[in-house]
């Protein structure tokens, strides 16, 4: 059983106040306009909720992942878009750079996030999704620079992010050295060799653009190489470690969305009258509400446990278990909450249909529930999944 310290309870209340006062009132408009909420991001920054995990010596707060998931849930409960932005501003790319980067790289990344940037982690490609190690974006060594060519797909924050962590297959004198990561900071308008392609309009969490990115002879200095060559044992494994934290964050966004939907459904059940009494008095709905509360609390326990596991990053199996359960719980709870609303919840005037759409992505993005189940099985069986083959091989 987890428990929050007094300091964490204060942090939770601070996050809740900001989310409910500033982000909840604009959530519907963000969904409709599909515009990046710059003003809300500014508030997130000024209130100290960006760069929370960055060490104090680089200007951050040095907070734990446990602290961070407490904040993420509150943000996501008010607005799914702000929940995701909170994840990206504290986990994922920034975590990889702060753990594996040089001093110069850490300073660059910290400065970007602490000025309000949401870093973009660039890994997925049109033909390399779950099988990420099959990526074809390449970086050819030329003197003191690498020349990047290729295409990335479903890049969260494409077009609004300045700091990019780009994963590519490195070639030195034509020899494949494995997968590495590079920092690229986009200043002003996108240069010709870093092309922001078409936006991929999504079903939910619509306030953050998902885009194609194309690299056309993009030059990156060798000093911006974050994860050195080494194939699956070094570069790629390091990337997956950074993803553990991001998966816990994504699962927490799903939890926040579901918790918000659940609370709205409970209020509605108490107020809605049918057959001369509140529908909350009917046993069928009581059982639905009871089951939802059990599932939500179980998801929260798993997420908090995962956030506290591991060393630099959460444990891979714990992160996978937590994300699977939280994401599937969110899909069920939002659908059951809509069911309690009936036809009213199905209408676009009601936030419930938005909650259902927002929750749907989390069994897919950041690792599908099926791939993550394979990771969990691998940890139990002491085996791993080589993504290039799609089957198990001994370690």
From Swiss-Prot:
Q: Which UniProt keywords apply?
A: FAD, Flavoprotein, Hydrolase, Plasmid
User: Which InterPro entries does the record match to this protein?
Assistant: AcdA, Acyl-CoA_Oxase/DH_mid-dom, Acyl-CoA_Oxase/DH_mid-dom_sf, AcylCo_DH-like_C, AcylCo_DH/oxidase_C, AcylCoA_DH/ox_N, AcylCoA_DH/ox_N_sf, AcylCoA_DH/oxidase_NM_dom_sf
Leader sequence segment: none
Residues the entry annotates as binding substrate: 243-244
Q: Which GO terms describe its molecular function?
A: acyl-CoA dehydrogenase activity; flavin adenine dinucleotide binding; hydrolase activity
Residues reported in the UniProt entry to bind FAD: 121-124, 130, 153-156, 272, 339, 343, 366-370, 387
Q: How is the cofactor bound?
A: Binds 1 FAD per subunit.
Which Pfam families does its entry note? Acyl-CoA_dh_1, Acyl-CoA_dh_M, Acyl-CoA_dh_N
Site keyed Important for activity: positions: 84
Family matches, as NCBIfam families: SulpropCoADesulf
Q: Which family does it belong to?
A: Belongs to the acyl-CoA dehydrogenase family.
State the oligomer form and interacting partners: Homotrimer or homotetramer.
Protein's UniProt name: 3-sulfinopropanoyl-CoA desulfinase
User: Which organism does this sequence originate in?
Assistant: Cupriavidus necator (strain ATCC 43291 / DSM 13513 / CCUG 52238 / LMG 8453 / N-1)
Gene encoding this chain? Answer: acd
């Amino acid at each position: 059983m987890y428990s929050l310290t007094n300091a964490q309870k204060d942090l939770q209340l601070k996050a809740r106040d900001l989310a409910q006062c500033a982000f909840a009132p604009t959530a519907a408009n963000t969904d409709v306009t599909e515009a990046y909420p710059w003003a809300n991001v500014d508030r997130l920054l000024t209130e100290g909720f960006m760069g929370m995990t960055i060490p104090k010596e680089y200007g951050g707060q040095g907070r734990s992942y446990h602290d961070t998931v407490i904040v993420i849930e509150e943000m996501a409960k008010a607005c799914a878009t702000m929940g995701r932005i909170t994840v990206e501003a504290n986990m994922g790319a920034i975590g990889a750079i702060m753990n594996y980067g040089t001093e110069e790289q850490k300073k660059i990344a910290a400065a970007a996030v602490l000025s309000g940037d949401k870093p973009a982690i660039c890994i997925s490609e049109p033909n390399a999704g779950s099988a990420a190690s099959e990526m074809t974006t390449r970086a050819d060594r030329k003197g003191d620079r690498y020349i990047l060519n290729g295409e990335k797909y479903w890049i969260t924050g494409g077009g609004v992010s300045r700091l990019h962590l780009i994963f590519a297959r490195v070639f030195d004198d034509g020899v494949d050295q494995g997968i590495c990561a590079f920092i690229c900071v986009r200043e002003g308008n996108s240069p010709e060799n870093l092309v922001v392609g078409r936006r991929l309009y999504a079903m939910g969490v619509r306030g953050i653009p998902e885009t194609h990115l194309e690299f056309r002879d993009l030059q990156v200095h060798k000093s911006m190489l974050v994860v050195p060559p080494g194939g699956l044992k070094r570069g790629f494994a390091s990337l997956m470690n950074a993803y553990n934290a991001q998966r816990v964050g994504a699962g927490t966004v799903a939890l926040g969305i579901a918790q918000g939907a659940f609370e709205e459904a409970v209020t509605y059940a108490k107020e809605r009258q049918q057959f001369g009494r509140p529908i909350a008095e009917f046993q069928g709905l009581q059982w639905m509400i009871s089951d939802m509360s059990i599932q939500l609390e179980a998801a929260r326990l798993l997420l908090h446990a995962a956030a506290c596991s591991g060393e630099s990053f959460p444990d891979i199996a714990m992160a996978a278990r937590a994300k699977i359960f939280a994401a599937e719980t969110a899909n069920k709870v939002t659908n059951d909450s809509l069911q309690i609303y009936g036809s009213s919840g199905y209408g676009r005037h009601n936030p419930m249909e938005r909650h259902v759409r927002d929750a749907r992505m989390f069994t897919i993005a950041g690792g599908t529930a099926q791939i993550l189940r394979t990771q969990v099985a691998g940890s139990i069986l002491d085996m791993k999944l080589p993504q290039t083959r799609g089957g198990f091989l001994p370690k």
